[in-house]
Amino acid sequence: MILAQTIIAQGDASIKASVNKNKILLGEPLVLTIESYFPSGSKIQFEQIDTIAHFEFLDKPVIDSSSENGGIKVIGKYTITSFDSGHWVIPSFTLAKGVKTDTIPIDVVFSDFNP
């Protein structure tokens, strides 16, 4: 189930960012998926993400690419977590001028205490 998703397109290029949950416990894994599409032969490239404030990467990203409708589709899946409680925001990602995702809010909480 995708809880947050943004899609922005300009011309034939597009980018979409989504997460599998918007609220996690401290240290709980979260999967960030970034899908981009751009026309074949364009100078647009998929940028690797290596840092996101307040989040840590748990594994190397899984990147997959395929040909689709005369262009290239690239999907990157990133397993991340946070050890900082609070309301954090995954920033927007830019594919090209004017082609970027919205930000994605994430709440990082302590576990509920039930004595």
At which residue positions do the language-model features occur?
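N-terminal signal peptide c-region/cleavage motif recognized by signal peptidases
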Residues: 4-6
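Surface-exposed interaction/ligand-binding surfaces
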Residues: 8-115
